[in-house]
Amino acid sequence: MTGEGRPDRAVVAAHGIRLGIAASRWNAHVVDAMVERAIEAARSCGVTTPTVVRVAGALELPVVALELAHHHDAVVGLAAVIRGATPHFEYVAQAATMGLTQVAIQTGTPVGDGILTCDSMAQALDRCGLPDSAEDKGWEATVAALDCALVLRDLRSRAAAGMPG
């Protein structure tokens, strides 16, 4: 993992943005850290009270993200899918990721993809934002969703004012 090309871990001024976070209960040690980092990222961006809900697993994220998207300006889905000995990993990772993308496209609400798809628990721990992790995917997915919500807010306000986007 290089993180090459990743933007700086910046914050955006997202005061007034309503954020929903849906997180899996599978691989709780990893996902709990991602939730904590997502909440911290939201607060650093001015979103003081994000809605946080927990779901059974990664496959439940899209339907809950869809519901959150109806009442929030941005949504983040968080999970850790760890490869096992069967192809189940492939199906879960693809379905959950595609589901979050479909929610964003169908609703026009940005959905940050914080689904870790890792070959091992060690890889997941290295990406979940713990103090000794190399990456912080909960933070990154949250800032990305908030940033996109701000872009959409600006584009929509321009359109409402009759200005070109």
UniProtKB/Swiss-Prot annotation:
Residues in coiled coil: none
Active site: residue positions: 88 (proton donor)
Enzymatic class: transferase
E.C. designation(s): 2.5.1.78
Reaction catalysis annotation: (2S)-2-hydroxy-3-oxobutyl phosphate + 5-amino-6-(D-ribitylamino)uracil = 6,7-dimethyl-8-(1-D-ribityl)lumazine + phosphate + 2 H2O + H(+)
Keyword Calcium: no
Any GO BP: riboflavin biosynthetic process
Amino acids binding (2S)-2-hydroxy-3-oxobutyl phosphate: 85-86, 127
UniProt-listed CDD domains: Lumazine_synthase-I
Cited function: Catalyzes the formation of 6,7-dimethyl-8-ribityllumazine by condensation of 5-amino-6-(D-ribitylamino)uracil with 3,4-dihydroxy-2-butanone 4-phosphate. This is the penultimate step in the biosynthesis of riboflavin.
Full protein name: 6,7-dimethyl-8-ribityllumazine synthase
